[in-house]
Amino acid sequence: MKPSILEKLQQLGDRLEEVTHLLGQPEATSDMDNYRKLTREHAELTPVVEVFQNYRLAQSDLADAEEMLSDPEMKDFAAEEIEAAKAKIGELDTELQKLLLPKDADDDKNIFIEIRAGTGGDEAALFAGDLLRMYSRYAERNRWQVEIVSANESELGGYKEVIARIVGLGAYSRLKFESGGHRVQRVPATESQGRIHTSACTVAVMPEADELEDIELNPADLRIDTFRASGAGGQHINKTDSAVRITHLPTGMVVECQDGRSQHANKAQAMKVLAARLNDAQKREAQAKEAAERKSLIGSGDRSERIRTYNYPQGRVTDHRINLTLHKLDFVMDGDLAEITDALIAEHQAELLAAMGD
């Protein structure tokens, strides 16, 4: 391990002692904001320091085993202990480097997930519905809540576009690599000849902004229109102009919201989605620049990139960024995404570790 990393770990250990001392003071709770800040810092530092303590213990075990090598009667035993200690040190070294990786400030946030049908017409819209169900089932597995923010339904039951809000700790950290092009290969229900069709959808995952106050939205930059909410096929489903469309004039971004119970609720939700989109655009620009510098495939923020194919006849799912193929399509479409998300996170961490070593 690099001396600079060892020094950093020692500093973190010293800081944990200091934070523990501060939290133990009688007046610690007099300033609740500072108390919460210290509690959060304590929770972040503790796992790092504990692993570092195990690392130093393994180093001590290695030194003891190396001393035993000089004793002929203990030589074989010492060799086994040395091998075990070196393996343990290697594992802990990797774990420590992962713990020291820079944290994404958005990882714990709720998300907006936007699914748009692309090429493939009605079949693409049906696939958009399948993707929404997949992410909803995954959210259920993680005990997250799913709210439909806006939906433009197709006549056959799918979605031309749908935006959902997923509420739960770590939602963004687990789903942020889902952004991009998703392709499906299957025989549509409307296909009489049994031919396989290829359709596509685009998924965008955006962290929810903490507060609208954090986003600079000049009222002069917004055009707000109201209209009647409509259901599938375009029929009006109420008699008041409760649906809201907000256009951000500088960027041309348009957000529509009509699923709320009132115009006020729809406007508030649309503003949240707009704030998330603007944040996301800035984030993707920074990610693209960073990814170009280190030739990253994961987390590049490129929405035009085809990231995954769902092949129904073969029952397989392939993530093209990491060359991962799983022959468990039914399980994946039912929300069993852990194997895919874990692999993507691991690959992203490997890229960050490689960058640390440069």
From Swiss-Prot:
InterPro entries: PCRF (IPR005139), Pep_chain_release_fac_I (IPR000352), Pep_chain_release_fac_I_sf (IPR045853), Prokaryotic/Mito_RF (IPR050057), RF-1 (IPR004373). The modification N5-methylglutamine is found at Q235. Its main location: cytoplasm. PROSITE patterns: RF_PROK_I. It is found in: Cytoplasm. Keywords: Cytoplasm, Methylation, Protein biosynthesis. GO terms for cellular component: cytoplasm. GO terms for molecular function: translation release factor activity, codon specific. Methylated by PrmC. Methylation increases the termination efficiency of RF1. The keyword Cytoplasm applies. Belongs to the prokaryotic/mitochondrial release factor family. Peptide chain release factor 1 directs the termination of translation in response to the peptide chain termination codons UAG and UAA. This is Peptide chain release factor 1. It comes from Neisseria meningitidis serogroup C / serotype 2a (strain ATCC 700532 / DSM 15464 / FAM18). The gene is prfA.
